[in-house]
Amino acid sequence: MIVPIFFLFSLLFSSSHGAIQDFCVADYSAPQGPAGYSCKNPAKVTVDNFVYSGLGITGNTTNLIKAAVTTAFDNQFPGVNGLGISLARPDLAPGGVIPFHTHPGASEIIIVIEGSLCAAFVSSDNKVYLKSLKKGDTMIFPSGLLHFQLNAGKNNALFFVAFNSPNPGLQLVDYALFGNDLATELVAAASFLDPAEIKRLKAVLGGSG
């Protein structure tokens, strides 16, 4: 029952509604504009445009953050284009983390399917909202606020995420600071971090400068 209820949540979470036409399946052959993808000719739309099977596959967590995120955004799932909804599936190995990040274009709601999580977001006045989550728990992360999810347990963790946008955007704080080519001296001046530590993190995260 958990997953069907979650899908209902994702629909209620949407703030966008098709007022002019029933749907706007993404036309990947047309140029993408600021408002998203153009609509596919309805005569060429099939039921397969509204079905996506990618979230049934376990992600590969053999990486630096011991986590994988499989997305069902408008660039993978054409049916969500224009509907104001999308989904994602994060898999976290023990010790895995989705590091501090923001979604500039969307709020999100998660539901834990397997394992447990430590999750938090930080408000604009720097207040932390932290909670340990278990199977079946849900948590909301307001749009644009820094947040993270950590698997502090001994078993793998799986949760699903719903967004009120077909493409919520993503900025990881660590990569924004250290995965770029901004000069170390400037990063140090702007962040108060030690230059040696900045260079170390740039090397780890693929930055330069």
Curated annotation (Swiss-Prot):
Glycans are attached at N60. Residues 53-199 form the Cupin type-1 domain. Antibacterial activity retained between pH 7 and 10. InterPro entries: Cupin_1 (IPR006045), Germin (IPR001929), Germin_Mn-BS (IPR019780), RmlC-like_jellyroll (IPR014710), RmlC_Cupin_sf (IPR011051). It is found in: Secreted, Extracellular space, Apoplast. SUPFAM superfamilies: RmlC-like cupins. Pfam families: Cupin_1. Its main location: secreted. Mn(2+) binds at H101, H103, E108, H147. GO terms for cellular component: apoplast. One of its GO terms (biological process) is defense response to Gram-negative bacterium. Keywords: Antibiotic, Antimicrobial, Apoplast, Disulfide bond, Fungicide, Glycoprotein, Manganese, Metal-binding, Receptor, Secreted, Signal. Disulfide bonds join C24-C39. Residues 1-18 form the signal peptide. One of its GO terms (molecular function) is manganese ion binding. Antibacterial activity retained between 10 and 70 degrees Celsius. Has antibacterial activity against B.subtilis (MIC=5 ug), B.cereus (MIC=50 ug), A.hydrophila (MIC=2.5 ug), S.marcescens(MIC=10 ug), S.enterica (MIC=10 ug), P.entomophila (MIC=2.5 ug) and P.rhodesiae (MIC=10 ug). Has antifungal activity against F.solani KACC 40384 and F.oxysporum KACC 40032. Probably has no oxalate oxidase activity even if the active site is conserved. Belongs to the germin family. This is Germin-like protein.
